[in-house]
């Protein structure tokens, strides 16, 4: 058997992996919300999510940021995403002041690995939480949501994790910034 014959299956596998890596990122959030998908860079050592482009766009458009940290293998994230989809008709008008940002993660990404970048500044998750005055400065919780102004200043303290704002009235309170 020739070397080329032995390597052919590996070449096919490599081509398939390369094709999958080249496909555009898809949001887990419903398309109706027009989410900006941010994939992590720096894997496998760290997962850095760069909010710079979303922040710049928010500044240009005079919008706030609704930043969603979800994990592809998180059942509670799937539940929240399904809730948003099922209630889109009622919720979408209240999302108008926001750009929705979907940070695509996985449950294997923990706090020591997760970094948030804004401009030239990249901070580990806990340091980022502390820098914005977020009381949730512990381990990464999926799903998590932050509401920011266009300067990445938090607009309110947010709940996180299971059962988080899964009713329309709760979601509307958050979008309206009612504490």
Name each region found by the language model.
Residues 71-83:
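Conserved redox-active cysteine motifs that mediate thiol-disulfide chemistry
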Residues 9-19:
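Bacterial N-terminal signal peptides
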Residues 87-159:
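Thioredoxin-like thiol-disulfide oxidoreductase module
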Residues 155-179:
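Thiol-/selenol-based redox modules, centered on thioredoxin-like
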Residues 66-67, 145:
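Hydrophobic beta-strand anchors of alpha/beta hydrolase catalytic cores
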Residues 46-65:
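A short beta-strand-turn-helix
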Residues 1-11:
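Bacterial N-terminal signal peptides that target proteins for export
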Residues 23-44:
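N-proximal helix/coil linker or "cap" segments that precede and/or mark the start of modular domains
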